[in-house]
């Protein structure tokens, strides 16, 4: 899994195209346990980009029924038919309107491989000054975000299995906060942020109800501020 030092220069500067390509994962063990009811032991970078390893929460089955478990996967879903990992540079977000038909995502959607991506904050470019300025967006109440996502498993030529995940996005045209990000003429998008009471409902929902959870988070529940990128860390995360 690549680290920040391997990123292209434009990405090291903190601005990338696309929707949510950069976020801060939840790294604190107690916050993972408190807000997501899972234990996680893998180290992760302080910021995540496509191709990095980061935690996600999925449903597991044991003798007592369903439960949540934390796993570590690549940010950017790798479909089982892909020949290599490069496709993950383009599959870190899945549009909710077309996720059921796009080859990269339709199997995960059809088979209900839903997950929750724990994030302290996400980063988006604000163009109000005439140039892209990176801003941090987070929950106003101090809780981490639980972002609706899909996960998949990919087996490489060496037989090793790698997990990966993507964030689901929805239209945000007219959203009081999210309309401030990306270029003025771009369609406005936002990740689908789940409320805590909906975590298990999202993971357990019948297939026909999956889209019921992909709704806009109210602007009053979020806050945003400029957050210029710091010099990159060389920390790497493993998904082995």
Q: What do these predicted ranges mean?
A:
Residues 2-240:
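Short linear sequence motif anchored by a di-proline
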């Amino acid at each position: 899994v690549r680290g920040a030092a391997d990123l292209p220069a434009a990405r090291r500067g903190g601005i990338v195209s696309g929707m949510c390509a950069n976020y801060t994962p939840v790294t604190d063990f107690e916050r993972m346990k408190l807000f997501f009811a899972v234990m996680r032991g893998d180290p992760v970078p302080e910021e995540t980009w496509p191709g990095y390893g980061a935690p996600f929460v999925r449903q597991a089955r044991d003798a007592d029924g369903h439960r949540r478990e934390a796993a570590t996967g690549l940010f950017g879903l790798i479909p089982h038919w892909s020949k290599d990992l490069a496709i993950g540079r383009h599959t870190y977000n899945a549009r909710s309107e077309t996720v059921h038909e796009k080859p990269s995502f339709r199997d995960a959607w059809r088979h209900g491989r839903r997950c929750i991506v724990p994030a302290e904050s996400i980063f988006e470019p604000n163009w109000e000054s005439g140039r892209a300025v990176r801003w941090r967006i987070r929950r106003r109440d101090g809780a981490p975000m639980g972002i609706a996502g899909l996960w998949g498993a990919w087996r490489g030529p060496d037989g090793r299995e790698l997990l990966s995940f993507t964030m689901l996005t929805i239209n945000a045209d007219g959203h009081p906060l999210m309309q401030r990000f990306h270029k003025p003429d771009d369609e406005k998008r936002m990740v689908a942020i789940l409320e805590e009471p909906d975590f298990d409902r999202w993971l357990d929902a019948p297939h026909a109800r999956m889209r019921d959870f992909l709704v806009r988070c109210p602007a009053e529940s979020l806050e945003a501020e400029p957050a210029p990128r710091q010099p990159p860390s060389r920390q790497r995360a493993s998904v082995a």
